[in-house]
Design a protein with these regions (language model features):
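Short, hinge-like loop/turn segments at secondary-structure boundaries
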Residues: 1, 20, 77-83, 134, ...
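Class I S-adenosyl-L-methionine
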Residues: 1-63, 162-164, 169
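Structural signal for conserved beta-strand scaffold positions within catalytic alpha/beta enzyme cores
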Residues: 2-3, 62, 82, 90-93, ...
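Short, acidic/turn-prone active-site loops that include or flank metal/cofactor-
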Residues: 4-11, 66-68, 87-88, 94-96, ...
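A contiguous loop/helix-start segment that scaffolds small-molecule binding in enzyme catalytic cores
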Residues: 17, 27-33, 45, 51, ...
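Gly/Ser/Thr-rich loops at beta-strand to alpha-helix junctions
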Residues: 39-43, 68, 122-123
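Short, acidic/small-residue loops that bind anionic groups at enzyme active sites
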Residues: 51-72, 83-90
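Glycine-rich, charge-decorated loop segments at or immediately adjacent to ligand/cofactor-binding or catalytic sites
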Residues: 70-77, 153
Length: 201
């Protein structure tokens, strides 16, 4: 087994190297498993790996997983869609690969009832500013989920305006920024807990 995953805030292993490892391993072994966190078809660069395998005439099977957005929502008890509150969901990332043109991710995310931002924790200040500039309200509830579905999972509830504060939390694991009124209950619970701790002194 060989780990080829990236780390939060650090450069991931070069994708071409991963593609080569896959092809080389498939030529050497009868069965090779490329295990990914979440679902490979959502921000998993699966298409590049599939293309490499197809170019090498190597048969493959993609087994779907549970993307971290759904795992985080289930863990928090906060559905991404809610009757009368959230009917549209956008999955987006502010990160742009080398040589890629920037996308209007913020405009798409701000116009949705619920937005889930992948790979944005290291750019929290920029994410908040971009969403607010695109029309999102400053008091929009935000739920930040680190290491969703893992034993060391952690959630931080705050408003969009407060999002830059997550820089103080020492986040190191894979993190989602989930934005929208669907997370109002999580924000209210966090505020009540903060008041309770303040009252206890």
């Amino acid at each position: 087994m060989a780990s080829i995953r990236g780390r939060c805030g650090r450069f991931a292993t070069v994708q071409q190297f991963i593609n080569k490892r896959l092809v080389d391993a498939a030529r050497k072994h009868r069965v090779v498993v490329r295990l990914k966190g979440g679902d490979p078809m959502l921000f998993g660069r699966a298409q590049e790996e599939i293309a490499a395998l197809e170019a090498a005439a190597i048969p493959y099977e993609v087994v779907p997983g549970v993307t971290s957005a759904l795992a985080a929502a289930a863990e928090a008890g906060a559905s991404l869609t809610q009757r009368g509150v959230a009917r549209t969901v956008v999955f987006a990332t502010p990160r742009v690969g080398e040589g890629e043109a920037p996308s209007n991710w913020a405009g798409s995310a701000a116009s949705a009832d619920t937005a889930v931002i992948y790979m944005g924790a290291g750019q929290a200040r920029e994410v908040a500013a971009a969403l607010i500039a695109a029309g999102a309200a400053r008091d929009t509830p935000v739920l930040v989920s680190e290491n969703a579905s893992l034993p060391q999972a952690r959630r931080i509830a705050l408003t969009l305006e407060e999002l830059p504060q997550i820089a103080c939390y020492g986040i190191t694991g894979p993190t989602l920024i989930m934005v929208g009124r669907a997370f109002a209950a999580a924000l209210a619970a966090a505020e009540q807990e903060a008041l309770r701790k303040y009252a206890k002194g």
